Each structure stands twice: as C-alpha cells, then as structure tokens.
C-alpha cells in the first residue's frame, strides 16, 4: 500500500508538470526580429482592429509645413506653413485603406527665408499667379489611391495630388498611429512644382537666372489627425 501511494504521488507530479510546462496551443507564434529565429509567443501586431470606417480630419489638430530652396546657393532655404482644411481617413480593422487631405492654399505663409528677411514679400509672391494663384485655386488636395503597410506603423502612400487644377501621382512614406480612439497620419513628400505649372525661377523654362534659380522640388511635411 505504501509503495502504491508513492507511485500515485509521482504520477500526480508528472501530470501537473506536463500541464504547467507545456505551451498553450492557441498562443500565437512569431519569429523574433533579432535574426536568431527564436519563437516568441504573443508578439504585438500594432493593429487596433476595433478602429474601423471613415474618420474625419480635425483641421485644428492637423499641420503642414513646406521647404523650398535655391539651386545655386548653399544652405539657402525658405520655410513656411499651409493649413490643413479638411479631409478623411478610411480604416478597415485598424488598417489605413484610403482617404484624402485638403490644403487651404490661401493660408500659405513664409515663416523664414534664406536671407532672413522679406517673409511677407515671399508670402505675397507665393499667393500670386506667378506661383500658386490662390485666388483662382484656393485648395490643393491629396487623394490616397493605395496604402501599402510596410511593417509596424509605416506605410507607403500613393495617390493623386492636385495643385492649380492639375493632378499628378505622388508616393511617399508615412507613419500611421491609432491610439485612444483617434489616428494620426504623418508624411513627407517631395513634390516637383513644375508638374503643376508652378514655373517661376525654374531653369527648365527660364535662362539667365543667375543664382536666383529656385529648385523645382519642394518638400511638404504634414500631420493629419482624425476627430
């Protein structure tokens, strides 16, 4: 009888050990990112699957800045802002699938210039028909046609950008973060202004400009935040 009791105790210990040590069958397995190939259960996927549908852009929380430069003058940069007017972002199970951002071109503003002067003069010039002709074309718009998730919060956004009534494709990387019932989309695009008939100071179309040649490409950085 004593031997049987010892045997029974050993059986119980073995059974308990089996259930404690074995890995649950429903625990998701992924390969770690450090290149060792070790299996790591329950790795986060950075997706909020409850975030779904079309979300409106909050213009008061969204921002956009631009950077221009002169081609032949080292470190000559002009900086400024333009307001985000409206837009939306479309999500399916926490994944960005589409949307659009509308910019208020009448709000375009130069905050600093390469010569540290004449910001108001540059602002007026940008609004004139020599540049963006905001009286005739008060809005610019980017419409997402493809949102390819590249891992984590990083996407490659492709879409149609309309400036001065002309539309052309553009692609750029963006970070999309969903948290606390809202989303932010932050991207940086390099844009060739001459495609949109903004030719002033471009050596593609004008000669004898000297060091007043303005780079055809400018940088637009924006952050669109949903309501």
What residue ranges belong to the model's regions?
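Low-complexity, acidic/polar, glycine-enriched regions of mature
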Residues: 2-227
């Amino acid at each position: 009888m004593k031997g049987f009791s010892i045997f029974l105790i050993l059986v119980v210990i073995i059974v308990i050990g089996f259930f404690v040590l074995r890995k649950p069958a429903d625990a998701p397995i992924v390969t770690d990112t450090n290149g060792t190939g070790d299996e790591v259960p329950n790795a986060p996927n950075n997706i909020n699957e409850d975030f779904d549908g079309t979300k409106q852009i909050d213009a008061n929380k969204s921002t956009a800045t631009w950077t221009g430069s002169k081609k032949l003058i080292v470190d000559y940069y002009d900086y400024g802002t333009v307001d985000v007017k409206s837009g939306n972002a479309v999500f399916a199970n926490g994944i960005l699938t589409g949307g659009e951002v509308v910019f208020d071109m009448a709000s375009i503003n130069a905050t600093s210039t390469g010569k540290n002067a004449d910001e108001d003069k540059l602002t007026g010039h940008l609004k004139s028909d020599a540049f963006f002709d905001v009286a005739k074309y008060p809005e610019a718009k980017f419409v997402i046609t493809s949102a390819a998730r590249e891992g984590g919060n990083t996407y490659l956004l492709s879409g149609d950008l309309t400036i001065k009534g002309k539309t052309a494709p553009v692609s750029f990387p963006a970070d999309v973060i969903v948290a606390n019932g809202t989303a932010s989309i932050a991207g940086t695009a390099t844009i060739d202004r001459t495609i949109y008939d903004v030719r002033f100071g471009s050596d593609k179309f004008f000669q004898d400009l000297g060091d007043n040649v303005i780079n055809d490409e400018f940088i637009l950085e924006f952050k669109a935040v949903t309501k």
